[in-house]
Amino acid sequence: MSKRVILFLLTNLAITFVLGIVLNIIFQVTGIKGTSTTGILMMSLLFGFTGSLISLFMSKSMALRSVGAEVIQQPRNQAEQWLFNTVQRQSQKAGIPMPDIAIYHSADVNAFATGATKNNSLVAVSTGLLDNMTEDEAEAVVAHEIAHIANGDMVTMTLLQGVLNTFVIFLSRMISTAVSGSRDENGNSTQNTLVFWVVDIALQMIFGILATMIAMWFSRYREYRADMGSAQLVGKEKMIAALERLRHVHEPQEMQGSLSAFMINGIRSKELFMSHPPLEKRIEALRNL
């Protein structure tokens, strides 16, 4: 699984999980039993989108801290000047404001783009990529990241994740309310608080896994689109060459806690949880353009 979407998803899931617990506490303290479907849905929307929006607006600063990168204010050497010129040229061609640029020290052959909006975005590449790829290949990788920004992928992912969060919280609460509810000897509705909490938290974890599968499927779809965007900016042969290069380099190590927003490369795992399609499929899709 790639370093790019993982941090966003983990941050989002953590925030949503904590907010879900806070929601439980609010209901218990206020005495709300969760019987109002409309009320639960509104609260689920509020808490579901809060998690994804916080993740979105934190994405750029978190990405920079995670890799220890600093934004290039003024190119200091040939590599930085080349990257600056390449990003500037491609962003103009794609019709977006020029993103911030960063180079981070890592042996991984990788790059990522992140940021809350097209006006506040970041493109970062590793020293491993600059050391191991030709200029044509590196140019294609940068174009791939520019395509992610131009396509508005981070915002789209945020909206999708907000919807998924909402359903996770809503379904968990509705089911846990039904399972934990009963009637006393007088026919009054009662609720087993312990059962409610246990079932609600367990269901949020289960539904959260299913939501992650959906998010990963959408991420794979976006990778194909970004590859096509790169092909439009620099030509498909350069993008194919970049992907072929990735097949001959070591698989990148996972970062502590993962990272970021739009990595060009990804570590293979079971397909349902892969944020990127297999390189072979991406190359085949480009050749069929």
Swiss-Prot record:
MF GO annotations: metalloendopeptidase activity; zinc ion binding
GO cellular component: plasma membrane
UniProt binding sites for Zn(2+): 144, 148, 223
Cell location: Cell inner membrane
Gene3D superfamilies assigned: Metalloproteases ('zincins'), catalytic domain
Class of the enzyme per the UniProt entry, highest EC level: hydrolase
EC number annotated for this UniProt entry: 3.4.24.-
Co-factor requirement: Zn(2+)
Active site, UniProt feature: 145
Cofactor note: Binds 1 zinc ion per subunit.
Coiled coil: none
Pfam families xrefs: Peptidase_M48 (PF01435)
Record's keyword terms, sorted: Cell inner membrane, Cell membrane, Hydrolase, Membrane, Metal-binding, Metalloprotease, Protease, Transmembrane, Transmembrane helix, Zinc
Superkingdom of source: Bacteria
Record HAMAP family: Pept_M48_protease_HtpX (MF_00188)
Family: Belongs to the peptidase M48B family.
Name of the molecule in the record: Protease HtpX
